[in-house]
Structures are given as structure tokens and as C-alpha cells.
Regions:
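Beta-strand/loop subdomains of soluble extracytoplasmic proteins
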Residues: 146, 150-154, 158, 168-171, ...
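Generic detector of contiguous secondary-structure segments
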Residues: 56-74, 128-151, 194-206
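Short beta-strand-turn/beta-hairpin segments enriched in glycine/proline and small hydrophobics
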Residues: 3-20, 25, 127-144, 171-177, ...
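A structural signal for short beta-strand/turn segments enriched in small hydrophobics and glycine
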Residues: 7, 25, 33-42, 85, ...
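Alpha-helical hairpins and coiled-coil heptad-repeat segments
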Residues: 62-116
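Long, amphipathic coiled-coil "stalk"/hairpin helices in large membrane-associated assemblies
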Residues: 2-63, 91-96, 152-155, 187-191, ...
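Elongated periplasmic alpha-helical coiled-coil
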Residues: 20, 51, 84, 117-159, ...
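Structural motif
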Residues: 20, 28, 45, 71, ...
Length: 228
């Protein structure tokens, strides 16, 4: 016996494209219906502020590295002065007083602490540069899959914002893999009992009235369960 019903077709795999950063959209490289390959350019966001951030981070790192270099030189000099004071003290205790030796030790400890602090600043500056470059990279959005652009929700000139609180708020476009589609249909209750998982189905689409697609029943959900 044949069961006939109508329903809605959706892609089994559909990826919503959103931005992790805020910025004005300067280029939308595709249109709805375009086929794309994984890695293809979809959207470009104004990168000027993020390029400036990278330049500042690079300058901070260069300054931190220069300071660290000087701090290491000062530490090494203080270490040599302390070693020389200790050597003279061993040669003749009268050549270096306790106060002078203590002063040399203190100067070395201070120089060593400053060198460690400078190295920490270098580490922090490198992390800042990595983050700035990561933010810059996010101004270019590429397709994560092979598929087709099934929705474009924005226009050039609009501001992209992260969808922090709502997926719909940050949605820019949708790319779908239409090689596998699923059909959700509402079947009359009297016909549900005649359906079984794995049953073969023939599907016709309004857009292609002369073509019949073959599928299989993957799930049967009673109406009461759908309303939960």
C-alpha cells in the first residue's frame, strides 16, 4: 500500500556562518544558490582596526625584547661584579668589606629580578601578538564545507556581531551540503502504522516536478512526541 504525504525538505548538514568579532562587512563574495568548496571566501570584514592592533602588538613585542636584552646584560654585569667581589674577598678579606659584598649581592639579586620581569613581559607581548593576529584572521570567513549557499542574511555595509546571546543575532549566512537531504513529513495517524524504518520512499520536489528521488524512512515520530 502507498502512503502519500507532503512535508519540508532540509539539508542533513547545514552550517550557519557567524562572526567571532565585530566589524563592518566590506565584501560578500557569494550569492544565495552559489556552490562553494571548503575554504572558499564567503565574507570579508573591515580589517583596519585589527591590522592596527597587530602593528601595536608587534611594536610592544619589539620594545619588550629590547628591554629584556638590556636587563639580561645588566644581570650578567652584576653577576660578574659579584663574582669579582667574592674572588677578591677570598684572596684578601681586607680588599672587600662586608658592606661592599652585601651591596654587590643585592645589586645582582635586583638585576636578576628585573631580568625575569622583562622576560615575563616578552612572554605577555608574544601572547598579545598571537591574539591580535588571531583576531585579524577572523576578518576573513571561509566555507567550512563543500556545499551550496542556502541563505544570505546580511548585506555589505552592515555590521557583523558575534551571536553571543542568540544564534539568529549573529547569523550571516548558511552553507548546506545538499548531497544528502532529509524530508520531514506529517503523515495521517491512520497511515503511521503502515510505515516502518527502512521503507523505501519516492520523493518529488516542486522545483523538479519531473524528477523522482529515492529515499528511506529513518524515523517515525508520533504526533504526541513531536509536541513535547
Amino acid at each position: 500500500a502507498t502512503v502519500t504525504a507532503s512535508g519540508r525538505i532540509t539539508a542533513q548538514t547545514a552550517v550557519d556562518i557567524s562572526s567571532d568579532i565585530t566589524g563592518r562587512i566590506v565584501q560578500i563574495a557569494v550569492k544565495e544558490g552559489n556552490r562553494v568548496r571548503k575554504g572558499d571566501l564567503l565574507i570579508r570584514i573591515d580589517a583596519s582596526q585589527y591590522e592596527s592592533a597587530v602593528a601595536r602588538a608587534e611594536a610592544f613585542l619589539s620594545s619588550a625584547e629590547a628591554s629584556a636584552l638590556q636587563s639580561r646584560a645588566n644581570r650578567d654585569q652584576a653577576r660578574r661584579a659579584l663574582d669579582r667581589a667574592n674572588q677578591l674577598r677570598r684572596t684578601d678579606p681586607n680588599l672587600v668589606s662586608d658592606e661592599q659584598l652585601e651591596q654587590a649581592q643585592t645589586q645582582f639579586e635586583v638585576a636578576e629580578a628585573l631580568a625575569k620581569s622583562a622576560e615575563y613581559q616578552v612572554s605577555q607581548s608574544r601572547a598579545g601578538l598571537r591574539e591580535a593576529r588571531d583576531q585579524l584572521a577572523k576578518t576573513v570567513l571561509r566555507s567550512p564545507i563543500d556545499g551550496q549557499v542556502t541563505r544570505v542574511a546580511v548585506e555589505e555595509g552592515e555590521v557583523a556581531v558575534p551571536g553571543t546571546f542568540s544564534r539568529e543575532t549573529g547569523l550571516l549566512m548558511t552553507v548546506s551540503d545538499l548531497s544528502v537531504i532529509q524530508v520531514n513529513v506529517q503523515v495521517d495517524e491512520t497511515d503511521v502504522v503502515r510505515l516502518h524504518l527502512g521503507d523505501s520512499t519516492d520523493v518529488t520536489i516542486d522545483a523538479f516536478p519531473d524528477t523522482s528521488f529515492t529515499g528511506r524512512v529513518r524515523q517515525v515520530v508520533p504526533t504526541a512526541d513531536r509536541q513535547k
